[in-house]
Regions:
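Active-site His/acidic residue clusters
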Residues: 224-231
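Catalytic alpha-helical scaffold of carbohydrate-active enzymes acting on polysaccharides/glycoconjugates
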Residues: 1-123, 130-189, 196-211, 233-252
């Protein structure tokens, strides 16, 4: 028996925040105002933590110059164990497109930036554009990565039954191994576009089927940066209701 054989479903929520190098300043400002700051502050106040978060290098640089108080909040949450920061290539490269040495170097740049700014030794990786190839495992391990988030479609395309993906996996290349977590496609498309009760029903169903781990990770920009989502998530009350439902699932022993 392992830790996933009994008890509530472990739901892991992951967020990816990115603005490309050279993007207009007003785009950074609008996303900070409409997405990054309101989501994190309301999630903190509403008890949605802990979360995992990836900040891209260009966004981290801009925030350091223009919104240090926001980074201070991230640092406080990380120090308290309420926010786990994820690695990636610093400038958001698609890792399989780079030579091996450049892959490792880009990740090490991000690792050092997170250590220097927040005092954390990040070991998980957000896979840019979720593009994977098996040879990445050895390079990620060499960069100090212990686990990576990967779309469940990669598993399905390799012949894994979808119902087997609600558990941690390990992969290996060059004699080096790496933990792999499958991002559930259904949850990724449901949150935040479906009513929270629909997501709750999905989570209850997963637990009833005997699953003990579900990973939902995607762009944070869909919580206020995509067209129509600001009103839906904040003004209409999706986020407040989602946090209420999430709390209820916890009280039921479901999640």
């Amino acid at each position: 028996m392992n830790e996933y054989d009994s008890g509530p479903l472990l739901l892991t929520l992951g967020l990816h925040a990115h603005q490309p190098e050279g993007n207009f300043g007003h785009v950074f400002e609008e996303h900070l105002r409409d997405v990054y700051e309101p989501f994190l502050r309301r999630a903190t106040d509403g008890g949605l933590l802990p979360l995992t978060l990836h900040l891209s290098g260009p966004l981290l640089d801009w925030l350091e110059t223009n919104a240090r108080d926001y980074l201070d909040l991230i640092g406080e949450l990380a120090a308290a164990g309420n926010l786990e920061l994820l690695l990636a290539g610093y400038y958001e490269p698609i890792l399989p497109s780079l030579p091996r040495e450049d892959r490792v170097e880009q990740i090490l740049w991000m690792k050092e930036a997170l250590r220097g700014r927040f005092g954390v030794d990040a070991t998980g990786l957000w896979l840019t554009e979720r593009v994977w190839e098996p040879a990445l495992a050895a390079d990620l391990a060499d960069a100090g990565v212990k686990y990576v988030l990967v779309d469940d479609r990669h598993f399905v395309a390799s012949g894994f039954p979808r119902e087997s993906l609600f558990a941690p996996f390990r992969t290996e290349a060059g004699g080096k191994s790496l933990g792999v977590f499958a991002i559930d496609e259904k949850l990724r498309y449901m949150i935040p576009f479906h009513p929270p009760e629909s997501t709750a029903a999905c989570l209850r169903g997963l637990r009833a089927e005997g699953h003990r781990l579900a990973v939902a990770a995607d762009d944070i920009e869909k919580f206020g940066g995509w067209p129509g989502t600001r009103d839906w998530v904040y003004e209409t009350g999706w986020l407040v209701e989602f946090m209420r439902v999430r709390k209820g699932l916890g009280e039921e022993g479901q999640v």
